[in-house]
A protein has these predicted regions:
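Helix-loop-helix
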Residues: 35-40, 138-153, 229-298, 303-304
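Cytoplasmic coupling helices
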Residues: 69-88, 150-191, 261, 285-305
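An intracellular "coupling" helix at the cytosolic face of ABC transporter transmembrane type-1 domains
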Residues: 109-119, 171-178, 188-191, 200-247, ...
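Transmembrane helix-loop-helix hairpins at lipid-water interfaces of multipass membrane proteins
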Residues: 8-63, 139-169, 259-263, 390
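C-terminal portion of ABC ATPase nucleotide-binding domains
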Residues: 504, 512, 521, 526-567
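Conserved "ABC signature" C-loop
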Residues: 410-459, 481-483, 554-557
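Juxtamembrane loop-to-helix connectors within ABC transporter transmembrane domains
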Residues: 91-135, 191-202
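ABC transporter TMD-NBD coupling linker
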Residues: 262-338, 379-381, 430-438, 514
Length: 567
């Protein structure tokens, strides 16, 4: 989003500030000189100069108002641009990188930047520095160059001290980003709809409040010491500037008074002195803020420079055939960045075109992790995964248009039904016939509500049951004509009847396509072509249901144990 008009207005109003200021100063000098050397014939001249001075004051007011308008507009734009750039970058990062706590901390650090503040601080330092230099030059031109050098030296020392202090304070603030994330997480537990019942039933509130207080106090103590030191430094600098200001006025008064120069010159130099001691603390403060913003900009750039995952934005498959997909996995190992051990070890699987397979095993055995690798969401630590349609290999960055999936934690979009379904293929967003057809296939059309009906209670929409949300997720998958269908244990939270319905729908969804179902409910595995039993990240058994039941192995024991629960 660009706004050239407001940007131009912003730069013009900032750059016009110093010329208007100096025009006011010198016009005031000439008015005072004319009054001092009053001449009855100078009425018109005085009137013109006073009118000019009033015009300058009026222009200064107009300039300030126009600047405020441009800053307000640019602030709104900069907030959008910052959020957009961070979200756009996030959408291009790999899932593994997104789940890394270090990446989450980097993202939070990047969000602390204010683009308009950074721009305004750069402009402020530039304008105030130019103003300061010109004021010192004018002071020097009237013979007060030693005083000008003293003031300049004090300013340089102040800028150096404030730079050091700003770096230390910002370093503390940056280091506290991860603990601030923890506080926000604890707050979310206290207000989130899903966590509130358990938090209240088990009386966890006081414990969570205590943890928040401990983190807050720790952060506060770290920052408090630096703030006291910073404010002590500011107080010392302010005292020095007050004394220097008084000395400057005294020198000007004695020097000009003893030399018999005009009152206008004294007024000019007095105003310059006042401007100097107004500009110096302002410049120091703006420079201090700029140092902090530059450090935050480095954090922002650090996040934007993270390595991106290459994905194709072309929704049309690069392979023009309707063949079912073949998946070939060889000697695959995978380890999460935060884990000390491999989550998957030496996985070797070939899923043939049109084959239905089931990944079964206890929770945490590695089933869902392998699915994420098959989806191309994680890169393998070692080994390889290849995808084929016919004789052609499907490249990893083209997988999005070849696979349709219903996740265990599928997205419950608290938005209109249209948006919930169209997530499967945004090209069909305005195609009501395709959306309705997908709903019918998923048996989600019984809601009896229009496509633009808002669902989800968060914004006052219709609340749906788990089974109804499930149907919307399946309708979303129907909208995508993929050659590989994956059902990643999305029925875990459903009642038995809804679970059976969902499984039947999945079997229809994967007709004539390669299909993978991930489940720990083994009755579902009776209807697939091949079963892979996972345990501690390894495949320990493989075969059809009948083959595995003939072997007195782990699958048979698990199946019989689950079956006994229903007898």
């Amino acid at each position: 989003m660009k706004d050239k008009r407001n940007s131009l207005l912003y730069f013009m109003t900032n750059l016009l500030g110093p010329p208007i200021l100096f025009a006011e100063l010198f016009t005031t000098k000439y008015v005072v000189d004319l009054i001092q050397n009053f001449n009855p014939n100078a009425y018109l001249h005085i009137l013109l100069l006073v009118s000019l001075l009033m015009l300058m004051l009026y222009l200064a007011g107009i300039n300030g108002s126009l600047r405020a308008i441009s800053v307000t507009n640019l602030t709104a734009i900069s907030i959008y641009e910052l959020e957009h750039s961070i979200l756009n970058k996030t959408s291009k990062l790999s899932t593994a990188l997104l789940e890394d706590p270090a990446t989450k901390t980097k993202r939070e650090k990047a969000k602390r930047l204010s683009l308009i503040d950074l721009l305004d601080q750069w402009m402020g330092v530039t304008v105030h520095l130019v103003t300061l230099v010109v004021l010192i030059v004018v002071l020097s031109c009237y013979g007060f160059y030693i005083l000008a050098l003293i003031i300049l030296g004090v300013q340089i020392l102040q800028l150096y001290l404030m730079r050091r202090m700003s770096q230390k304070v910002e370093a503390i603030s940056a280091n506290q980003t991860s603990t601030v994330r923890t506080i926000n997480y604890l707050i979310d537990l206290l207000v989130n709809r899903n966590s509130i019942p358990e938090v209240r039933m088990y009386r966890m509130s006081s414990y969570l409040f205590t943890k928040m207080r401990e983190i807050f106090i720790s952060n506060f103590k770290q920052m408090h010491r630096k703030v006291i030191y910073s404010e002590s430094l500011n107080f010392s600098q302010s005292l020095i500037m007050i004394l220097l200001n008084g000395i400057t006025i005294a020198i000007l008064a004695m020097t000009i008074g003893s030399s018999g120069q005009s009152a206008g010159l004294f007024v000019l130099l007095l105003q310059i002195s006042n401007q100097l001691f107004a500009v110096i603390p302002t410049l120091t403060r703006v420079y201090s803020d700029l140092v902090k913003s530059r450090l935050r900009y480095e954090d922002y750039r650090s996040y934007l420079d993270l390595e991106e995952q290459v994905l194709s934005d072309n929704l049309e498959s690069t392979i023009k055939n309707i063949d079912a997909m073949q998946v070939q996995i060889k000697h695959l190992f995978f380890r999460y960045a935060t884990n000390a051990k491999d989550t998957l070890r030496n996985i070797n699987i070939t899923i043939h075109p049109g084959e239905r397979v089931a990944f079964v095993g206890e929770n945490g055995s590695g089933k869902s992790t392998l699915v994420k690798l098959i989806l191309g969401l994680y890169p393998s630590t070692a080994g390889s995964i290849q995808w084929f349609k016919g004789e052609n290999e499907v490249l990893a960055h083209n997988l999005r248009q070849e696979i349709r999936v219903v996740f265990q934690d599928f997205t419950k979009l608290h938005r209109p039904i249209r948006e919930n379904i169209a997530l499967g293929n945004m090209d069909a967003f305005h195609d009501d016939s395709r959306l309705v057809a997908a709903m019918k296939k998923a048996e989600a059309d019984y809601f009896g509500v229009a496509l633009d009906t808002l669902v989800g209670p968060q914004f006052g929409g219709t609340d749906l049951s788990g089974g109804q949300w499930q149907r919307l997720a399946i309708a979303r998958a129907y909208l995508n004509n993929g050659s590989l269908t994956i059902f990643d244990e999305p029925t875990a939270a459903l009642d038995p009847y809804a679970e059976q319905q969902a499984f039947d729908t999945f079997m229809k969804l994967g007709e004539q396509q390669t299909s993978i179902i991930v489940t720990h409910r083994l009755y579902m595995s009776k209807f697939v072509d091949k079963i892979f039993l996972f345990e501690h990240g390894e495949i320990v058994e493989c075969g059809t249901h009948e083959e595995l039941m003939k072997v007195d192995g782990k699958y048979k024991k698990m199946f019989n144990r689950q079956s006994s629960l229903y007898v």
